[in-house]
């Protein structure tokens, strides 16, 4: 099937609770910045990257899709996802400006759209195209209850509500002060008991010394993992922390290539890998990370930059993908939204990658691409 047209789009969707914050960001909307690819038979594939809904930077991504990537795709065989991935990745002018940032986010949207189109053309959900299901359901952990912007009371209420809804894992944000975050961590652990897994996420705010201080005191709270404890590409510092604490380290949402993950693994600086199809040039590159993880017997927990619309298919079809983040901000924007029952993702049934926006979302949240 030949590619007939490639178009970009932008949706800005409100987050839960109007405004949320972690240790480094405060946002009111999530950006769904993507590509719509039409095949010669009329089949349409959708893919997107996730942003903080900053229109000028979102328009840099759509401009890259429309002016740099689209000309390389029109007329090509849409089903040849691997070849087209390399065609875009090795385009000399794009390679010169860098294999990260804007060009890679644009590439991610296009790659996901191609996989969506391919699965639709074959009339099967993406997880089936990827080899079929390896599990009946996927364990979810709830992040939406744990923002730093929440009061202590709201944090505890949200944690208890998540447990009541069947979630067996939750994650809370840290990165304000060591003392305050230890207090919140201990309060949540007391509230939810010992049988619920409790992860923390620093979003890279603290330095090595603060992270070491925090971990020394936090180990008693049975922390499932400490996510992004340090600046995202500080491999040596992560290795030092990993060797100094019993808390497993998780990272990867800001890594752009399988090579970056390989370096963290080589330095024994990570225990949980968290690739994101919206940041890593799409599904094609994330599959390579999952293969790498499997070879090293490391678990994978994809980061929900796509709010898990796409990643759920990877969790269902790949053994290393053990758990999956739950943030419900954009779920109602899609024809087949993520579905979580008693704290577990249920298998998508419609053909494709679960990335087709509803007409209502298109009308309500669409923004200009230039």
Protein language model regions, located:
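Metal- or metallocofactor-binding catalytic centers and their adjacent structured scaffolds
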Residues: 5, 38-121
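Structured beta-strand/loop patches that form or line metal/cofactor-binding pockets in enzymes
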Residues: 1-46, 50-54, 331-333
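Shared catalytic-loop signature of beta/alpha-barrel
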Residues: 216, 222, 233-344, 348, ...
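N-terminal amphipathic alpha-helix/helix-capping segment at the start of soluble metabolic enzymes
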Residues: 1-2, 9, 120, 124-136, ...
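Metal-dependent enolase-superfamily TIM-barrel catalytic cores that perform enediolate-based chemistry
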Residues: 128-245
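Conserved, mostly hydrophobic/aromatic
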Residues: 3, 42, 69, 110, ...
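Extended hydrophobic packing segments that form well-structured cores
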Residues: 353-370
